[in-house]
């Protein structure tokens, strides 16, 4: 995609406050908050950011969502926002969190990770996705009335938290390499480290869903 197109992610002094304001504004207008974690170095992030500004998707977003873009830098930021919203971490750039302002619940838990390949998602697919989650009712708590299932889900959450910590540790290693690579000084071990971390983090959402579906 053309250089600079969709480069809309800007560092913020207080991204948590930005997200909280978006959720509050969404509640006042009976919409949902659309929180996008991404970065300008990431072509998938720029692709989604650009598409969000273009009709017909821009019209859907304006009608149904309060949008906030969160810059994750070179992977050193963003986890605090994900955790504030109830997620263990973000596993891709971009990551899309659609939040119901009344409950604070993330509503697109089942398929939000597809945006890690946002460049390949068409405009029509994008419109269908955001129209779907604008209208979808909140899912009932699957553990309600079942202490045994609640305990199982708690163990799965603890497992994901461990995996999310491993991803955060990987970001701390790979992030500076990524910054050097983007500056034209690629470290010798960057490609292997990046690919290893990418494969690990991108597998986590599917693994967690498989555990919950067993």
Regions found by a protein language model. Give the residues of each.
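Extracellular/periplasmic catalytic domains that process cell-envelope and extracellular macromolecules
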Residues: 27-29, 59-62, 87-92, 101
């Amino acid at each position: 995609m053309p250089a600079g197109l969709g480069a809309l992610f800007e560092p913020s002094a207080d991204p948590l406050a930005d997200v909280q304001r978006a959720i509050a504004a969404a509640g006042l207008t009976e919409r949902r908050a659309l929180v996008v974690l991404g970065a300008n170095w990431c072509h998938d992030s720029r692709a989604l950011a650009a598409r969000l500004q273009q009709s017909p998707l821009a019209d859907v977003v304006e009608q149904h969502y309060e949008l906030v873009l969160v810059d994750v830098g070179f992977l050193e930021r963003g986890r605090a926002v994900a955790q504030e919203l109830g997620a263990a971490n973000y596993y891709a750039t971009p990551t899309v969190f659609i939040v119901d302002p009344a409950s604070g619940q993330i509503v697109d838990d089942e398929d939000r990770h597809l945006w890690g390949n946002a460049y390949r998602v068409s405009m029509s697919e994008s419109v269908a996705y955001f129209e779907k989650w604008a209208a979808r009712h909140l899912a009932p708590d699957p553990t309600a009335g079942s202490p045994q299932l609640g305990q199982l889900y708690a163990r799965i959450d603890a497992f994901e938290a461990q995996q999310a910590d491993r991803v955060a540790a990987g970001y701390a290693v790979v992030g500076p390499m990524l910054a050097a690579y983007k500056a034209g000084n690629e470290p010798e071990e960057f490609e292997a480290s990046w690919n290893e971390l990418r494969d690990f983090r991108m597998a986590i959402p599917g693994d967690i869903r498989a555990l919950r579906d067993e």
